[in-house]
């Protein structure tokens, strides 16, 4: 482990020096790549340096105990040694996690698709609740949110809503949200007071950059049509809505949120790139996925991952058996406890798998 940490520290210093090189500064692409690499190494190096400092302090404390000390001073040194040893253990555990293979998509922006599934109008209303929850979560994390496509219903729900979240580490925080979300509550329209169960599906895709997924004009077909509002009525007499079809894969994306055809096309292409990136990544990982499923659920939108129970004010994440009795605050975007536990679970499972393969 420590050989790897020394190599990481050496690379960090090399990258830091390169970022001061005038040739690098003048090359925007190279500068961006190196800045990203420096950022990805920084926490590991900072933690490793603190670890080395703590080890040095432990050696000094042990050396002091070999000297002639009065009882009070000896107790002080022993107390400090105990604290330093505990800190050393914490740092070792943290370094093991920091050296785990990183998800290359973690720092990417994301595109999120929410669809009302089983439950009709109630499912569409729940899709709107989830969208609001993610909006609040985005605000708390200083992520920029942009709606790319929406199909609202007459009663304030969404058959489907697609949006992007932009900001550092957006995918690392949102990637565990893919799957089926179940709600149990009494609908406002229910006179008998019976609890209904509905579901909405969420799909989280890392947003692909142009250089990662190239979309050739010859591979796409663009159709234009009049945009429609809730209930399907036409709200626009000009053909500003756009449908982009990727001919080789058959993947289709529609966008009608903007007033101009050009803006709708740009948004549709962003979603298409993300879907193509996901499509190609799944193809590449097909063999590996057959033997090693995702450590925190499959990420399949049909897999039930979480239940939101209104009568009990309860949120349960079924993948890790976590239950919180504070539904209202979670729906207000206070999702950190859920997400942190999912991340911790994934890291624990990764450590186990690495220990078995070592």
From Swiss-Prot:
Instruction: Give residue numbers for the modification (N5-methylglutamine).
Output: 233
- What cellular-component terms does GO give this entry? cytoplasm
InterPro entries attached here? PCRF, Pep_chain_release_fac_I, Pep_chain_release_fac_I_sf, Prokaryotic/Mito_RF, RF-1
Modification after translation (UniProt): Methylated by PrmC. Methylation increases the termination efficiency of RF1.
Q: Where in the cell is it found?
A: Cytoplasm
Give GO terms: molecular function aspect only: translation release factor activity, codon specific
What's a Pfam family this protein contains? RF-1
Record key words, sorted: Cytoplasm, Methylation, Protein biosynthesis
Report the family membership: Belongs to the prokaryotic/mitochondrial release factor family.
The UniProt function text for this chain reads: Peptide chain release factor 1 directs the termination of translation in response to the peptide chain termination codons UAG and UAA.
The name on file for this protein is Peptide chain release factor 1
What high-level taxonomic lineage is stated for the organism? Bacteria, Bacillati, Bacillota, Bacilli, Bacillales
